[in-house]
């Protein structure tokens, strides 16, 4: 290829990246960068975080199944935006740190940060030429996906030349407020930082849920994936957090750690789980045969104030895990 053709090709490639937030990662930039950025940028009222190392996941033989569930579930509307402009998120995204300020991970409203190599000036030029919506806030340009008028629409911005942030407008502004020092960051939460330290570097996928979100996620696992007549409110109140991690090797293994206030409350949850496992509601799980088998073979033990849960299965059973966890 001649030098002129090569230069024209590079210009075209960069233009495509500009439309798609220029998520043209030059390689893995360190597993801690997205995590550090998320903890120092997310607002303090964030109740849930989820981390995925897509560069590591892509090396798994299970990746064809993983990408259908993990990537699409976590990026949702944002990945639709990327695909609509010809960017392949499963190839070009290496790390993402997501956050939620609500109580359910299945609901809308996730925001996040992604590390990469960006060309902000080229993106601004493209949006100016195409007259796509751009807002200004705290000295940053917020680029809109779509008309920019939808309150649930996705916006993105460049925090620096190697870090992008995205989410709904109010969440993205909250991230900028944190970075400008006018609001507290998530890393001021010492308990959550302690939980994060347990998970960092041990798995390509992990997450933390706190507050009511923790109980909302723990309840379906404890109840066998189906609503039952037992009032679980008293059992769920002592739950401080739910930590989870997922590993892949010819299938998946998920480990869930339910952190309780006291060893006594963890013992109560353990007893409840054993009772429900032998009840018809557990074996008749509403998630289908896959989830019923998965939950029936769930391994559990108490470790002080923690209830530790382990389950494993083939890659195509991941849907059931996600449904049970929602």
Where are the regions that the model predicts?
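N-terminal secretory signal peptides that target proteins for export/translocation
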Residues: 1-13
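Bacterial N-terminal signal peptides
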Residues: 14-26
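Structural boundary/hinge residues at secondary-structure and domain interfaces
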Residues: 31-145, 149-151, 194-236, 269-297, ...
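A short, solvent-exposed beta-edge/loop patch
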Residues: 50, 149-180, 251, 299-318
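A conserved glycine-rich beta-strand in the N-terminal activation segment of trypsin-fold
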Residues: 152-218
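Helix-loop elements that line ligand-binding/catalytic pockets
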Residues: 236-263
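C-terminal regions of proteins
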Residues: 239, 245, 252, 289-302
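A short-motif feature that recognizes glycine-rich, charge-decorated loops
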Residues: 248, 260-277
